[in-house]
Amino acid sequence: MSENQTEKLVRTLSGRVVSDKMDKTVTVLVERKVKHPLIGKVVRRSNKFHAHDENNECKEGDLVMIEESRPLSKTKTWRVSKIVEKARIV
């Protein structure tokens, strides 16, 4: 008999860090483009997610990938999986 191993698909999103003031937590702004149902114009919609950053590696302005995880607190159910691009220092 072969054992069937089913991997659960993990939701991943890409966004920009807008706040890193909390300990081990970052706020990530995720933007998406949707077509307005009545007007037909493409509109930007955004959501903010609190994500767990174990080593406090993320800084404000970084582009990160976040993945869904178990609830870590009242508002935190996402985890930073990788930093795609570091913010440019001006």
Swiss-Prot record:
GO terms for cellular component: cytosolic small ribosomal subunit. One of the primary rRNA binding proteins, it binds specifically to the 5'-end of 16S ribosomal RNA. One of its GO terms (biological process) is translation. It comes from Methylobacillus flagellatus (strain ATCC 51484 / DSM 6875 / VKM B-1610 / KT). GO terms for molecular function: rRNA binding; structural constituent of ribosome. This is Small ribosomal subunit protein uS17. Keywords: Ribonucleoprotein, Ribosomal protein, RNA-binding, rRNA-binding. The gene is rpsQ. Belongs to the universal ribosomal protein uS17 family. Pfam families: Ribosomal_S17. Part of the 30S ribosomal subunit.
